[in-house]
Design a protein with these regions (language model features):
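Mid-domain alpha/beta scaffold segments of enzyme catalytic cores
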Residues: 1-268
Length: 268
């Protein structure tokens, strides 16, 4: 069973042919697609998309790149929306949340402080409702981990993970799986490929981050990623590990269901 644990299917890049993209994913054997929100403005859209497609599920959260334009009452709105969604079997997590220190303008000073405050507040919401989190950890792994350790008891996915071995172990010890996607398909992505090859499948999940992070076979200025490419990511991971794609699909799907337990009701 193939599961794309991170796909921004609501993005405008899919507005012209979203139904065709979904059909391609289904034809490629993708049983479930997790669609994370990026802010208050698309909570309803990700919910509607999830309900309108086979195997669609959604997460609610405020992405660190959009925290700058968010207001404190967006956190209140998030909590209210989460509470109202707890009976919805298509709602599986809090996300996409976390920290981004790659973008220099938001990596220091007041912008960074706001990022951390919103991240911590969203971890509080996840803890209150017993939900997993989908984490954005770009150049921020240690501080993301620091907040997780303060909260304790949370679990989920470190999306598009590209940290050190020590950082990988830190997330795993906190109950998190690591998201493996298109970046792993590039031979020069040595650190990501090492994690993908050496860590047990019980610590890995597949993702696309579509329309972003296209795999090597799509890498060009005019190429967008799609959820159906998770099948190719699974094949590339199988080749890297010297195993078959069925083993990869089964192992990573089992991990996804463990860290996102509400997903079970949709794929059962």
């Amino acid at each position: 069973m193939l599961i794309d644990t991170h796909c921004h299917l609501d993005a405008q890049e899919f507005d012209e042919d979203r139904d065709r993209v979904i059909a391609h994913a289904v034809a490629a054997g993708v049983r479930a697609v997790v669609i994370p929100a990026i802010g208050r403005g698309n909570f309803q859209k990700v919910r509607d998309l999830a309900h309108g497609m086979p195997g669609g599920v959604y997460a609610l959260g405020i992405h660190p790149l959009y925290v700058g334009g968010a207001w404190d009452d967006d956190l209140s709105a998030l909590r209210a929306c989460v509470e109202a969604s707890m009976d919805d079997p298509r709602f599986v997590a809090i996300g996409e949340i976390g920290l981004d220190f790659f973008v220099k303008d938001i990596a220091t000073g007041a912008a960074r402080e706001k990022q951390e405050r919103f991240y911590a507040a969203q971890l509080d919401i996840a803890a209150e409702f017993g939900l997993p989190v989908l984490l954005h950890v770009r150049r921020s792994q240690d501080i993301v981990l620091k907040h997780l350790r303060r909260h304790g008891g949370l679990h989920g996915i470190a999306h598009a993970f590209n940290g050190s071995e020590q950082q990988a172990r830190g997330f795993i010890e906190q109950g998190f799986a690591l998201g493996i996607g298109g970046a792993m398909t590039f031979p020069r992505a040595l650190q990501i490929r090492r994690h993908a090859q050496q860590l047990g499948l019980e610590h890995l999940v597949l993702e696309t981050d579509a329309p972003d992070i296209p795999p090597a076979w799509l890498h060009a200025p005019d190429k967008r990623n799609t959820p159906g490419q998770v099948a190719g990511v699974a094949q590339a991971l199988a080749e890297l590990r010297g195993t078959d794609v069925m083993t990869i699909a089964a192992g990573t799907a089992a991990t996804a269901l463990r860290v996102l337990p509400r997903l079970e009701a949709v794929v059962a």
